[in-house]
UniProtKB/Swiss-Prot annotation:
Biased composition, class Basic residues, residue ranges: 572-581, 1869-1878
CDD domains in UniProt: C2A_Ferlin, C2B_Ferlin, C2C_Ferlin, C2D_Ferlin, C2E_Ferlin, C2F_Ferlin
Name of the featured protein: Fer-1-like protein 4
Sequence segments annotated as region (Disordered): 554-606, 661-686, 691-710, 1245-1276, 1322-1361, 1862-1885
Lineage of the species this protein comes from: Eukaryota, Metazoa, Chordata, Craniata, Vertebrata
Compositionally biased region (Acidic residues): 1247-1257, 1328-1337
Biased composition (Polar residues): 559-569
Residue spans, topological domain Extracellular: 1-1952
Alphabetical list of Gene3D superfamilies matching this protein: C2 domain (2.60.40.150)
Keyword flag Transmembrane helix: yes
Residues that hold Ca(2+) 1 according to the record: D1464, D1470, D1519, D1521
Primary location recorded for the protein, binned into one broad class: membrane
UniProt keywords, alphabetically: Calcium, Membrane, Metal-binding, Repeat, Transmembrane, Transmembrane helix
Length: 1992
């Protein structure tokens, strides 16, 4: 099925250049190699294209010849466009044609082509000669233009396109990093190859009828399970507030927990762990809200002030690897003030685990710095730290087709009284990230119109995945949910850079689904209306639109014009009542405002608070949506079988519906336009077989259901029923009217086809890999080629696809799909080019990621059509249903856009609503077709030709047939594996029922087995298969295999169901022998094993005169030879049965452990029976199990015939029985080993498979050494668990220039020094004296693997650099149990758990753990019997120690526990450890640790254990209670026996380096040389030879490092004996590299073991950090290692406050207006708030200067390694004991203003981390606010320098008072600034990342002195200025403001600083006095002047 083109020859080429021929067909371009030639060129290359089964008529092939150049772009020489219509009819053409140049002239260049066409069905098309009747008058008419051909893009245009793309990437601020990396990484490929090259792609056919699980899969249900949400609140930083008392509240769902309250700090440290448990479905858990809120505690608890809140849903955490956020900072924002910026950060660790998840304990938390907050935020990958505010607008317009029946008590009473439907009062509730908004209530309407907009304010992008729309009924008593729809924000938005867009949706209809409308008082399926599960009933649809507006900048607040009617969580308002409802047309015009009217030309303003606003909208215009079109849903019921026998009493009918159309209760099928009147709702659809328009009187009568028929039993021996549909097939057709948005679903179907081909190909590849057969790499290559070709075809087709009435989401989604598929084609091409045999697994993993992306893109968020519901009626009652997406059956003219099930017979499984998962009520074979009414003619085109419609004028009412084609089905059932146990014995009596069509047959019953080997052939004769004969190969019928457990006294118990597709053999097809396949069994959502079988569907031959018979080429044709003489069953034919080969199975019987009671009796004489392939191997009967549970006869063997293929070999069954009196046997337990591959003798492989593999990979793997190297496979969660435990730097070794100070004295180091150095090493930041590679070069040597002859002689000339010895020895830290690292120590002794009872070993959850009855310890070895003759003794006994009792000394080292589950009501626990083995028990109850969830134990417990009596060690953590019994927190179990006997030597770990004494003294009972000698003796090697710098072991030579001097040049006395021990230790640590004999030995380690509780299996209860040492009692054991916790060192910190300067002046003199402050300093160490100290008050400081000379003295306990202060105090007022709390060593300095009457005013603060504090400035002039920044330098460690003095700034966050003061100063226009305001702005204030401004409010001169308590007692000092060593009183007056005592100072501050003002005032006063005197004397002088002459 392909077009093949061979380019043979080129002639007439100009000049000599590099030529290349390019061929383009349907948008796919392929190129030849570059040929350097002259005028002629021989090409000789072959190319192939797929055609998807569509004809070539109208298609063309474009051929172009270009000149290639290394510098310039390719220059085209000529083009030829060939029509392929003649090729379609001829099948083969040889052409020699001339090319046409750019000016459309015939050029002299000619090309010779050989074209071949392979049609899809082997027949070519027809040639339409009339299409070529026009005579050709010009040579130009030879050219057929190709509309899809485009000229090559010139260089300028390509450069411009890249510039535009780069500009878009830079302009867009949001996007995922992965997308950008992919684009940038593929950019060079785009420059070299503008088109993707593919060749020879043949697309695989897509199966629909029997593809895996059918469409009506009842297993896809929501199953509730147990989840744990763990939240560790570590610390908070940069909390906004002044002298706050913060605590953090964590809320998950409805559960809320709070931390302790810390006083007077903005950077509290908590380290508290909270555990939340839920029993929910995963879907519901994703929607739960995580809310982290910081509060400022007040005097009364309910008066706490909110600082900030962080919200996200748990779905974000589930999307992370392992559902884990580790030590991330959650940014806090105030919902009431969105303009305030970030309010602080809370550092948390978040984990979400389900039952059974692999434990991933986080590293122990430690206080971190705030320097990397912005780079380590609690945000998903790709989300930027700076998130702007955004407004999400949800526009709710109207609803249609709502239910008319109210449920509940009042609805039932109303219907009983009035006998009529009770209309609803609907309203819509929208939920978004904890916020809820509601529309108004529309009373008693089924088609309400709201036209309202709900606005939500949230940060962008929002940390949620869902937007929930819920339609509710405003009932009188309690509101009821009618239906729920969840919009996935990931589907309506994209964060990519190239095709990203903000959340947008609609306007579009949202379909609503829920439960069946019932009149009962209680709806059992009400959860479906709440959105918990898939709805089973169409409840109407809702017209909504969603948009999001992002605010980029900060805008000043403006008065809002909208009315707020609802608020956060419905606290600020209530929804409208009925009396407030507003009907359309009654709203005043002035009030009705469209949403877009509020937008103006100005930038939108940021809302002031997170409030939900409700606004009115204008109705949506009439032409906003697409026009209505008539749709036809056509169906034909071919088969109804597998019907439950309980439905036999009533007739059965069937109904299909889409929306409301098609329901038997609905008389009108026009639900979508029912409210528009009868004229508009009249259906005008063309009849099926008529081209004229339908008249009103010729409308079709809808068939709303099939005729009721009585069911009949199926043929055969099955209990099922079926409907008699042999001759007549009923038809169903439903007309409905919807908006025509079918192009949405067609585009989605195209993506689905690409995904389905990729999925099908990957499944086949995995099957081939499972069988280890050839062809897997070739099939993977073909799959990737199909991916590339399908993606490119979609991109080319998207350019021609038209969209009618698209909205914003449609346009954005079209761009996204084109970009994503284009990118996926390039990624697939990259995988295709890099595909090799050694990286196949990695390629499959990457291809699965592409598949997941394709499936996500294929989901249409705006479905235009509701789903199709198929209902089965029993009488008048609905009993079963199936829901089919309309997308799957939608018709399109283009095949790629057609639904996968459209026009095909599909298998549907009907399930009962609300039934248990896995229950199937019926199976249907149904033909469905959905399309436009104008395309109705095509609905019957895909029906089988032998079906004839009944005579009618329109659509057929039913189809009938007279002639039948008969088939024979041969069901070859070989075996089943892993079947569930159904009997109390832990076994089953399984049999299988095979059902196809209306026939059912049953296999024989095999008793007491979980792996039945039926080896049976079931033959179904005279089988009628519906469907087109030519489509049966691709669409075979479905075969159902039901496995049951046979009960003698009762019905059979269902065990599982599998589905299979038979291989179809038509008469003309050659016969192929079938191969056995695996079909998984499932029981609901639970895996129930697998069936190995194969099925053949053979068409019977009609050529004879007698009855139809099997064709002659079928083998075997006669089945009589397969009949078994005893049972009468047919056995498998030899061609199907696997080829058997004699194998020897050797069994090692070691012993039984932990057997419990059976039927209330103790086990006394057990025996082990092994069954494999019908043969049994029995062990001896233990004479007394209690005294010695080990077997004395260890090895037995048996010869069995097993299949040569390992994947077909049967499982091994292990049965443990007990021999009781009178010959009775009782089954104790059983175990099934499903695969025997791990027990096959190493080195035995199938030579035939090796040859085939070599032949297959010869062309795929490059030759040479590069092809032999294997790439690392993709990591798994198990590999992640094996990664070393990491922790933040603890500073034991220091960094930078202080490194030399950090090298401690070996005499001062202990085990904890080694432990913390190991933590630092595994963090990936080794110190300068430890620069070795962690992957295996820690000792600086390599295993010599040079020339083989040199290796045999033990010589080598390689040189290895020898590093110096580590300053501190380290150990290995595992963050999982040691068993996970070393395969459970089952290298030669395996442990098989025994189960008994129903459920077996494959049960889930609590049921599985309840069936455990003991363990069998042993092993197996399988190898061909032909090789057994060459062995003198059993191979399994090699290296097996003696099986005798032995006594051991076990030392259990308990380091600490992390994240323990709380056991007390206060959220804490009082843990202690209990270690037990049998009756031996040790505990630390007397040394329990109160009120801790992360206790540090440091305990060593010793036990004397004897094997095999006490093989298991139990380590449990209990909670100590004063009253009552202690509670178990969790426990872990360790198999001591396997550890002791393992070749990994797990009894005592190997140290990293050899030391005789000290903290790293050798602690094993044997020296390294003795251990190495013992290994050589066990492996048959000679004694190792020690040389200078090398050790020879066998034929290998290890280079070993010599003892290099330490870095301080100390010359140790190293003896030759110690040197040999160090060399032997080096060889032991690299023992795994010994060829054939090497195995990794356990190093010195600390393992992390998960703790579980028996009542909650699978749920992690914490982690225990520990290790154990095991020593034989006959060897003297070394002394135990001291791991007692380090006691904190008591320090005394002396802080002298000398002076302050530039302190903010907070008080104002009411008389003079002068500002001043009464300064005093307050200080304390965090965690010791009760020891808070204050200086005296410096009153009336007018310059900010203060003089104190005051000493603070603080005593605290300090842990140097952890850098924490240890505080012991009672956690509460009612606590009886003190608990230990740890805080970072931080000193707080605060400057306050003293007030006599009101509360004191806070001026500023400074927090200094004592281990890492900034050095102070030398003088106040150089002290700026920069010293208060994070990471300011230079820095020092006060615990090392011990004494420090300087000036430090105190800062304060700018508040409104500071802003007002600055505004007043600016308005006053002061010319002289104070001294403290002088300087640059960056020295006075700074802005943090949250936008908060901090200002400099003063400077403090202080002196710090740190002493140990012993030193302090030798030189005591007094507090304040007291003795001893008193400080002088400061040089300040007693009263700073006294005009008489201090007149000079008064003069300075009140006269001198204002002398200009005083002079001006004096001058004005003099002038005023002068004027007053003038005016006072003027009248007298005037009168005197006037009257003086008179007197004279």
């Amino acid at each position: 099925m392909a077009l093949t083109v061979c380019v043979r020859h080129l002639t007439g080429l100009p000049g000599t250049h590099d030529r290349q021929v390019r061929l383009c067909f349907r948008g796919f371009t392929q190129k030849t190699r570059k040929i350097h030639c002259g005028r002629e060129a021989d090409v000789g290359e072959l190319f192939r294209w797929p055609h998807y089964g569509s004809p070539l008529a109208g298609e063309s092939l474009s051929v172009q010849v270009v000149n290639c150049s290394r510098v310039f772009s390719p220059r085209p020489l000529g083009t030829l466009v060939i029509s392929l219509q003649q090729l379609q009819s001829a099948g083969h053409l040889v052409l020699r044609e001339a090319l046409v140049d750019e000016r459309l002239r015939v050029s002299p260049i000619q090309v010779e082509l050989d074209l071949k066409y392979q049609p899809p069905e082997g027949a070519a098309g027809t040639w339409a000669e009339e299409d070529f009747g026009t005579p050709i008058r010009d040579s130009l008419e030879l050219i057929i233009p190709n509309v899809g051909f485009q000229d090559m893009e010139p260089g300028e245009a390509q450069l411009e396109r890249r510039a535009v793309a780069l500009g878009r990437r830079l302009a867009r601020s949001l996007g995922t990093q992965d997308d950008e990396e992919n684009e940038l990484e593929l950019e060079p490929e785009l420059e070299e190859e503008p088109d993707v090259e593919i060749s020879g792609v043949v697309f695989s056919p897509l199966k629909s009828r029997a593809l895996g699980l059918p469409r009506g899969d009842p297993f896809k249900v929501c199953k509730a399970q147990d989840f744990q949400v763990g939240v560790t609140v570590l610390e908070a930083q940069k909390l906004v507030g002044v002298n706050i008392n913060p605590y953090v509240a964590v809320r998950v769902g409805d559960q809320r927990k709070v931390t302790a309250t810390l006083r007077g700090t903005n950077c509290p440290f908590y380290n508290e762990y909270f555990l939340f448990e839920f029993h929910e479905t995963r879907l519901h858990l994703q929607d739960l809200l995580l809310e982290i809120t910081a509060f400022h505690s007040q005097t009364l608890p309910f008066m706490a002030t909110r600082i900030g809140t962080f919200r996200m849903d748990l779905g974000m955490a589930l999307d992370q690897p392992d559902g884990h956020f580790h030590q991330k900072w959650a940014p806090l924002h105030d919902p009431r003030d969105t303009r305030a910026g970030t309010k602080g950060f809370v550092k948390i660790t978040l984990s979400v685990r389900a039952r059974g998840d692999l434990p991933l304990p986080p590293p122990p938390p430690c206080p971190g710095t705030s320097s990397d907050i912005e780079k380590n935020l609690l945000l998903p990958h790709g989300v930027q730290a700076e998130r702007p505010w955004a407004r999400l607008r949800v526009r709710v317009y109207r609803a249609e087709g709502l239910p008319t029946v109210r449920t509940g008590l009042l609805g039932s009473l109303a219907r009983a009284l009035h006998d009529q439907n009770v209309l609803l009062d609907p309203y819509v509730r929208v939920s978004f990230l904890g916020q809820q908004g509601e529309t108004s209530v529309r009373g008693e309407e089924t088609a309400p119109k709201w036209n309202e907009q709900l606005s939500f304010v949230e940060l962008f992008p929002p940390l949620t995945r869902s937007l929930r729309l819920q339609l509710r009924d405003n009932a009188p008593l309690v509101d009821v949910a009618l239906a729920t729809h969840v919009l996935d924000l990931r589907q309506i938005s994209n964060s990519g850079r190239a095709a990203g867009f903000n959340p947008t949706f609609g306007p579009a209809w949202v379909p609503l689904y829920g439960s069946l409308p019932s009149g009962r008082l209680r709806d059992d399926l009400q959860s479906l209306n709440e959105g918990l599960g898939e709805g089973i009933w169409f409840r109407g649809r809702l017209l909504v639109a969603v948009s999001m507006e992002v605010y980029e900048g900060r805008v000043e607040p403006k008065p809002s014009q909208t009315t707020q009617r609802s608020g956060l969580s419905r606290l600020t308002g209530k929804k409208k009542k009925k009396k407030e409802k507003t009907r359309q047309g009654q709203t005043p015009a002035g009030i009705l405002q469209p949403a877009s009217a509020s937008t103006s030309e100005d930038a939108p303003e940021i809302p002031s608070a997170m409030e939900v606003e409700v606004e009115d909208l204008l109705p949506l215009p009439e032409n906003a949506l697409a026009s209505f079109e008539d749709f036809l849903l056509f169906g034909v019921l071919f088969e109804a079988t597998m019907i439950d026998p309980s439905l036999a009493k009533k007739p059965i009918s069937l109904e299909i519906s889409i929306g409301h159309a098609g329901r038997q209760e609905e008389q009108s099928g026009q639900g979508s336009r029912a409210d528009e009147g009868s004229e508009s709702s009249t259906l005008e659809v063309q009849p099926l077989l008529e081209s004229e328009d339908r008249g009103a009187g010729q409308e079709e009568q809808e068939l709303l259901g099939t005729p009721a028929q009585w069911p009949e039993p199926v043929d055969g021996n099955g209990p099922y029923l079926c409907l008699p549909l042999r001759h007549r097939k009923p038809c169903l057709h439903v007309w409905s009217c919807w908006e025509d948005y079918t192009w949405r679903l067609q585009s989605s179907n195209s993506v689905c086809k690409v995904a389905e081909r990729l999925d099908h190909g990957l499944q086949e590849v995995e099957k081939m890999q499972r069988r280890s057969g050839p062809g897997a790499c070739t099939r993977l290559k073909q799959t990737l080629e199909e991916l590339v070709a399908g993606s490119r075809q979609f991109c080319h087709g998207a350019e021609r696809r038209t969209m009618t009435r698209p909205n914003a989401l449609d346009r954005c989604r079209a761009k996204l799909l084109t970009h994503s598929l284009n990118l996926m084609a390039r990624q697939g091409l990259r995988l295709l080019r890099s595909l090799r045999l050694n990286n196949m697994q990695r390629t499959v993993v990457l291809a699965k990621k592409l598949l997941a992306r394709l499936r996500f893109l294929a989901q249409e968020p705006q479905p235009p059509l509701p789903d199709v519901l198929v209902w089965m009626f029993s009488g008048q009652r609905r009993v079963a249903y199936a829901r089919i997406p309309a997308q799957d059956i939608l018709y399109s003219v283009v095949e790629e856009e057609r639904g996968r099930d459209c026009g095909k017979i599909q298998s549907l499984l009907l399930t009962v609503p609300g039934a248990a998962p896995g229950e199937v009520c019926a199976k249907l074979e149904l033909f469905l077709w959905l399309g436009l009414g104008k395309q109705a003619k095509a609905c019957t085109s895909e029906l089988p030709m032998d079906l004839l419609p009944e005579p009618s004028s329109g659509l057929p009412q039913s189809l009938y047939r007279d002639d039948f084609r008969y088939f024979q089905l041969r069901a070859h059932l070989y075996q089943a594996r892993g079947v569930l146990a159904a009997d109390d014995s832990g076994l089953s009596d399984p049999f299988a029922r095979v059902l196809i069509s209306t026939q059912c047959q049953t296999t024989r019953v095999l008793e007491q087995t979980l792996s039945p080997l039926w080896d049976e052939l079931l033959v179904f004769d005279q089988l009628i298969v519906d469907g087109r004969r030519e489509h049966l190969r691709e669409e075979p019928p479905l075969v159902v295999i039901n496995v049951f457990d046979h009960n003698k006294f009762g019905p059979a118990v269902f065990l599982g169901r599998a589905f299979a597709a038979p291989r179809v053999k038509l008469i003309e097809d050659p016969y192929q022998r079938p191969e056995l396949q695996f079909f998984p069994l499932r029981k609901g959502p639970q895996a129930a094993g697998e069936v190995i079988a194969t099925f053949e569907l053979i068409e019977l031959d009609y050529s004879g005169h007698l009855e139809p018979s099997v064709p002659s080429d079928v083998e075997p044709r006669d089945l009589a030879s397969l009949v078994e003489p005893i049972s009468g069953h047919l056995s498998l034919p030899p061609s199907v049965r696997p080829v058997l080969r004699a194998f020897r199975v050797e069994v090692l019987f070691w012993g039984l452990r932990g057997l419990g009671r059976v039927h209330l009796f103790e086990i006394e004489k057990p025996q082990v029976v092994l069954e494999v392939a019908g043969r049994r191997v029995e062990s001896e009967v233990l004479p007394n199990y209690r005294e010695n549970p080990n077997f004395t006869e260890l090895v037995r063997h048996v010869t069995v015939d097993l299949p040569e293929q390992p994947y077909l070999q049967p499982p091994l069954s292990i049965l443990v029985i007990e021999r009781r009196a009178f010959g009775r046997t009782v089954l104790v337990g059983s175990h099934i080993v499903p695969h025997m591959l791990r027990f096959i003798l190493q080195g035995h492989e199938d030579p035939q498979e090796e040859e085939e593999t070599e032949e297959e990979t010869r062309d795929l793997v490059p030759h040479g050494p590069q092809g032999e190297k294997s790439l690392p496979e993709a990591g798994t969660s198990r590999q992640l668990l094996k990664a070393p435990l990491k922790k933040l730097t603890l500073g034991l070794l220091g960094q930078g220039p202080e490194l030399e100070e950090d090298i401690p004295d070996p005499e001062e180091m202990d085990w904890w020094s080694k432990y913390y150095a190991s933590l630092q090493e595994f963090q990936g930041q080794p110190s300068s004296d430890d620069e070795m590679d962690e992957a295996g070069d820690a000792d600086g040597t390599h295993l010599i693997s040079g020339d083989r002859e040199a290796q045999e002689q033990g010589e080598t000339d390689s040189k290895v650099s020898v590093p110096r010895k580590k300053a501190i020895a380290t150990l290995k830290i595992y963050n999982s149990s040691l068993e996970d690292e070393f395969s459970h120590f089952e290298d030669w002794l395996s442990v098989f758990p025994l189960y008994r009872g129903q459920g077996g070993q494959d049960g889930e959850g609590e049921g599985a753990s309840g069936h455990f009855v003991g363990k069998f310890k042993g092993s197996f070895l399988i190898y061909p019997e032909s090789e057994a003759k060459s062995f003198s003794e059993p191979q399994i006994s090699r290296g097996v120690p003696q099986n005798r009792p032995i006594k051991l000394l076990v030392r259990v080292y308990i380091v600490k526990a992390t994240n323990l589950a709380p056991a007390d009501p206060n959220g804490k626990a009082d843990p202690y450890v209990v270690v037990s083995a049998g009756k031996e028990q040790r505990d630390t109850k007397e040394r329990y640790i109160p009120k801790q969830l992360n206790p540090i134990f440091g305990e060593v417990l010793e036990l004397s254990v004897s094997l095999p009596a006490q093989p298991e060690l139990t380590v449990a953590v209990f909670d100590h209670d004063l009253v009552g019994s202690d509670d178990l927190i969790g426990e872990t179990h360790i198999d001591l026996e396997n550890r002791f006997y393992s070749h990994h030597r797990a009894n005592c770990g190997l140290a990293s380096q050899y030391d005789v004494n000290g903290y790293n003294a050798w602690r094993d009972a044997f020296r390294p040389s003795q251990i190495l000698a013992g290994l050589c003796q066990r492996c048959g090697l000679p004694v190792p030879e020690y040389r200078a710098g090398a050790v020879k072991v066998g034929s290998r030579v290890f280079l070993t490092p010599s003892e290099a001097p330490p870095p301080d040049d100390r010359k140790p006395k190293v003896t030759s004996e110690a040197s040999e021990e160090a060399q032997a230790l080096h060889v032991l640590r690299r023992w795994q590299e010994m060829p054939g004999l090497g195995i990794q030995l356990v190093p010195e380690h600390v393992e992390t073991r998960p703790l579980y509780h028996p009542r909650s299996p699978g749920l992690l209860q914490g982690s225990l950090h520990m290790w154990i040492d095991i020593f034989p009692s006959d060897v003297p054991a070394p002394p135990p290692v001291d791991i007692k916790p380090r006691q904190p060192i008591s320090y005394e910190l002396r802080v002298v406050i000398w002076n302050t300067d530039d302190v903010a002046l907070d008080d104002v003199n009411p008389l003079t207006g002068e500002r001043s402050s009464d300064i005093y300093v307050k200080s304390w160490v965090k965690g010791l708030e009760q020891d808070r100290q204050e200086t005296d008050v410096h009153f009336n400081s007018l310059t900010g200067e203060g003089n104190f000379n005051w000493r603070f003295v603080f005593r605290f306990d300090y842990l140097p390694t952890e850098r924490e202060v240890s505080v012991r105090r009672k956690p509460g007022p009612f606590a009886l004991e003190e608990a230990e709390f740890r805080q970072p060593a931080v000193l707080v300095l605060q400057v306050w203003d003293y007030d006599r009457i009101s509360a004191n005013d806070f001026l500023g603060s400074l927090e200094l981390q004592l281990p890492d504090m900034v050095r102070g400035a030398r003088d106040p002039e150089h002290c700026s606010v920069r010293l208060a920044l994070d990471g300011a330098g230079p820095r020092c460690n006060l615990f090392r320098c011990h004494r420090l003095r300087g000036w430090w700034p105190v800062v304060k966050m700018k508040d409104m008072e500071d802003v007002e003061r600055e505004a007043r100063e600016a308005q006053a226009g002061k010319k002289r600034k104070r001294k403290r305001r002088a300087g640059r702005p960056e020295d006075l204030e700074f802005t943090d990342t949250g936008g908060n401004v901090y200002i400099l409010t003063g400077k403090v001169e202080a002196e710090f002195e740190l002493l140990t308590v012993e030193e302090a007692e030798k030189r005591p000092v007094g507090k304040g200025r007291k003795e001893p060593e008193p400080l002088e009183k400061p040089n300040r007056p007693k009263t700073s403001f006294n005009w008489f005592v201090n007149p000079l100072k008064t003069f300075i501050f009140f006269i001198w600083r204002r002398y200009w003002r005083i002079l001006v005032l004096l001058l004005l006063a003099l002038i005023t006095i002068f004027l007053l005197l003038v005016f006072y004397t003027i009248p007298g002088q005037i009168s005197e002047v006037i009257f003086s002459p008179v007197h004279k």
